[in-house]
């Protein structure tokens, strides 16, 4: 397959949609090649199963119009950023050759999310190594962009907020594909978890003078080629 422009790496199926669903839809509308790599299958959960999660992931993938989606098969609930996991992730990145990586924000209550963030950091470094048994040629993604799919009530200070106003409904549709996670067994009285997600997007849109937004963080400085697209 052709190289990807962006690879969103997620601890579980649904995290990419939660933290970067609007960005994915925007990038696809701009003609970018976008993929998602789920590190685990997300199971066990109270109302899911491996088969249910596969079906939900396929439905969300269709909504997002992804160019590629895969699963690294690492263990849910006990994800660790160890050397075997780093080797597998770095090898996958070298094969897909994305220009940019998206990863979960490093501060979270969920140990899988913390481990996933550290794993992406380490794997990115490994992707450029020579004299190694990693598959593919050396490759080094330009930036890691961190998205927020967190279990803490943080008030982040983002590096930038992306205006996702035209893509908010598509993002919500993709999230709603994961009924076992966000609908089945959840309270039906408003505000529901989907209401909460919409309100968060509205807040970040309001913060930058737009309708709806998604916040992102970069540890490295971000360069601009112009100011035309500032909100």
Language-model region placement:
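Active-site rim/loop-helix segments in enzyme catalytic domains that contact anionic ligands
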Residues: 1-96, 217, 229
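Metal-dependent de-N-acetylase/amidase catalytic core
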Residues: 1-9, 80-231
